[in-house]
């Protein structure tokens, strides 16, 4: 009943208006799973390959018809007839079929679309929600959201070097309340920015992209918004940063052009330490560049006991990169992006490896998203306790928050909100 009888991919558009891959997988009993693949703006050099056509006459070279053809041709030919409940075997077949270390032949966007659609079809056939099918009976922890309310870097057209400024409603009693708290701060921040004569247009992930002068300027606005919304910074709501520092690491220096700073790796660590001393920062993502292992080690030795240090470009959801980081004592948290590695199986392997090393995991969206809310289910399935899925604007972001609210309702009295259990030190 769970044999795959049809696999069909199409080219659709993501939240930035760029093409992406969507896949439908149909099973023998008539059930169907559908998955759409996200894409990033700031991408790590070690990520699996997102296959683009390169035809400048079509979507400015960003079309994905080759990836679609790979799904409808080679992948479908090899997977039709396979049992959709055998996720590990199916993912392994696609990895072997591709035959490259970074999924560059068929494309990680082709392989991931099939991998996730297979899981969703199998869950439907088993009459289970996706979080339960993937996570089993123990899947019940609702994650604390990292809500990106001010954008900089590659996600906005302003002089702020750091890419994301986020709030984390750790004192909420449940996900529904966490979303409410975040929404109230978001709308209060909009009023504060408007009153200061600053723009309130939003960036790729729904956060505001005002023309602020510095990192501290952005943090001060957020603190004021938290307080005016009736909450206590550092108690009710914590702060988080995504530096995306690989984007401004040039010639061995951290070139923060917006602030006119040129910092050595040691000076960059001191800069971040000073921010953590002055603001209630719970988490810093990509505080050092993806191949600055010495900088990462210094950052971890300096702040790792009290701050969550998340590797995104550093680890790219890749078990091999993560193992190297664990061995070197770099970072203490894994950012989980399914399209960085390209299959559900490898994603879950990375989360398990992080857990064994006592690293936390943060389930994450990409800046180019769709209405697909799979990562909400995966956050609960893995009990990872944290999710990063943008601001309280744009339906591509809210789809994930709304799905978490639904999952909490389904879990009923067994649901647990991670809350302050994620705090370090």
From Swiss-Prot:
GO terms for molecular function: magnesium ion binding; phosphopyruvate hydratase activity. GO terms for cellular component: cell surface; extracellular region; phosphopyruvate hydratase complex. Its cofactor is Mg(2+). The active site is at residues 205, 337. It catalyses: (2R)-2-phosphoglycerate = phosphoenolpyruvate + H2O. InterPro entries: Enolase (IPR000941), Enolase-like_C_sf (IPR036849), Enolase-like_N (IPR029017), Enolase_C (IPR020810), Enolase_CS (IPR020809), Enolase_N (IPR020811). Mg(2+) binds at residues 242, 285, 312. Gene3D superfamilies: Enolase-like C-terminal domain, Enolase-like, N-terminal domain. CDD domains: enolase (cd03313). Belongs to the enolase family. This is Enolase. It comes from Paracoccus denitrificans (strain Pd 1222). The lineage of its organism: Bacteria, Pseudomonadati, Pseudomonadota, Alphaproteobacteria, Rhodobacterales.
């Amino acid at each position: 009943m769970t044999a795959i009888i049809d696999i069909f991919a199409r080219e659709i558009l993501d939240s930035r208006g760029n093409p992406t891959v969507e896949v439908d997988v149909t099973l023998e009993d008539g059930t169907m799973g559908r998955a759409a693949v996200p894409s990033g703006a700031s991408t790590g050099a070690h990520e699996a390959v997102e296959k683009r056509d390169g035809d400048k006459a079509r979507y400015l070279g960003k079309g994905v018809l080759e990836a679609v053809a790979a799904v409808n041709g080679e992948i479908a030919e090899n997977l039709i007839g396979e049992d959709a409940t055998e996720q590990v075997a199916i993912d392994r077949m696609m990895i072997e079929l591709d035959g490259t270390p970074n999924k560059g032949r068929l494309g990680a966007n082709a392989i991931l679309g099939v991998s996730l659609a297979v899981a969703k079809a199998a869950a439907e056939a088993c009459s289970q929600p996706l979080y339960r099918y993937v996570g089993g009976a123990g899947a019940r922890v609702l994650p604390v959201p990292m809500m990106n309310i001010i954008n900089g870097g590659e996600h906005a057209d302003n002089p702020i070097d750091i890419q994301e400024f986020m709030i984390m409603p750790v004192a909420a009693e449940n996900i529904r309340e966490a979303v409410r708290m975040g929404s109230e701060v978001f709308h209060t921040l909009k009023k504060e920015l408007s009153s200061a004569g600053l723009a309130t247009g939003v960036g790729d992930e729904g956060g505001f992209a005002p023309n602020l002068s510095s990192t501290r300027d952005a943090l001060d606005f957020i603190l004021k918004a938290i307080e005016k919304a009736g909450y206590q910074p550092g108690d009710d709501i914590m702060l988080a940063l995504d530096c995306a520092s690989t984007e401004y690491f040039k010639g061995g220096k951290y070139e923060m052009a917006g602030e006119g700073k040129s910092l050595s790796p040691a000076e960059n660590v001191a800069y971040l330490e000073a921010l953590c001393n002055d603001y209630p920062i719970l988490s810093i993502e990509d505080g050092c560049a993806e191949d600055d292992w010495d900088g990462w080690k210094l950052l971890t030795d300096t702040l790792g006991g009290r701050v969550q240090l998340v590797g995104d470009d550093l680890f790219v959801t890749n078990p091999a990169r993560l193992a190297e980081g664990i061995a070197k004592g770099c970072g203490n948290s894994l950012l989980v992006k399914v399209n960085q590695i390209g299959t559900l199986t490898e994603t879950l392997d990375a989360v398990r490896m992080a857990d064994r090393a006592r690293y936390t995991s943060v389930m994450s969206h990409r800046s180019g998203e769709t209405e697909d809310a799979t990562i909400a289910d995966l956050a609960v399935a893995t009990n990872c306790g944290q999710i990063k899925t943008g601001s309280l604007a744009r339906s591509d972001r809210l789809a994930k928050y709304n799905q978490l609210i639904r999952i909490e309702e389904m879990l009923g009295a067994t649901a647990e909100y991670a809350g302050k259990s994620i705090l370090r030190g």
